[in-house]
Amino acid sequence: MTWQFVVAGFGVGVLVGMTGMGGGSLMTPILILVFGFDAKVAVGTDILHGAVFKSFGAMRHRMLGTVHARLALWMLLGSVPLSLVGVQIASSLGDGTDGTMTRIVGSALILGGVGFLVKTFLTGHADDAPFLLKPRDRVVAVAIGAIGGFVVGLTSVGSGTFFGLAMLLVYPLTARKIVGTDLLHAAALLWVAGASHLLHGNVDLHAIAWLLIGSIPGVLLGSQMSIKVPERALRVAFGVVLVLSGIKIVGVPQASLIVVIGLAVGALALVVYTARQLLSREVATSPK
């Protein structure tokens, strides 16, 4: 089943490279439902795999100038220590609180995604001018990191989706810069959690090796596409992935089917929209 790992890795890699999110929400269910992994091993394998391939995506976005590195670092100051606190509390409380927190996070993603889509169509896009962090912005970044890190540690979800949602609501960043910053922060946070899972024996290194063969080129391709795709189309994709991630996390009936159909329709619409935009540009710039 090695080629299936490669295909799954590539598809998730492209999505994460373009939107910065959806990796864990998709890969963990794939490992459990398609490949028959034990849930604990699926989570550990997904986290360490995400740390590796998201690092490649973050480096590519950094080269493309679509990363606000200082914002990511300030969020890490809060997220790394609080994620460890969340893991410790989750271990002591059991599964009841985990399920409640997971539903809260999923519901927030659905509402945030819908709100973001509405805002995208009712208003213009964010300015691409440099955004300088003020003291207040740094405090907010640490707070976002602390809250998000705690939730990730407690529920094992939202390393990309939660922080992407928080940044789009708080900071005047373009969609592609949110994607790049989100990837850098998520990669660093996942390395911490992934190392812990590796030490506890919750990682299938054979599966990770084959997943990376697909996910690394996938995330590099997706990162490149994020600067080629028109801003509004990328923002729509961003919002759709937020909503679908929330549906999957909440556990809506037939969630997996809804997510697969939604991603397929969204991908087709994105390809058609982008092709039309590129064609119209060529027509506009061609000599009369």
Each predicted region: which residue ranges?
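Transmembrane helix-bundle signature of multi-pass membrane transporters/permeases
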Residues: 43-51, 76, 80, 182-187, ...
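Internal active-site segments that recognize and position negatively charged phosphoryl groups
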Residues: 139-161, 165, 169
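Interfacial segments of multi-pass membrane proteins
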Residues: 27-41, 162-177
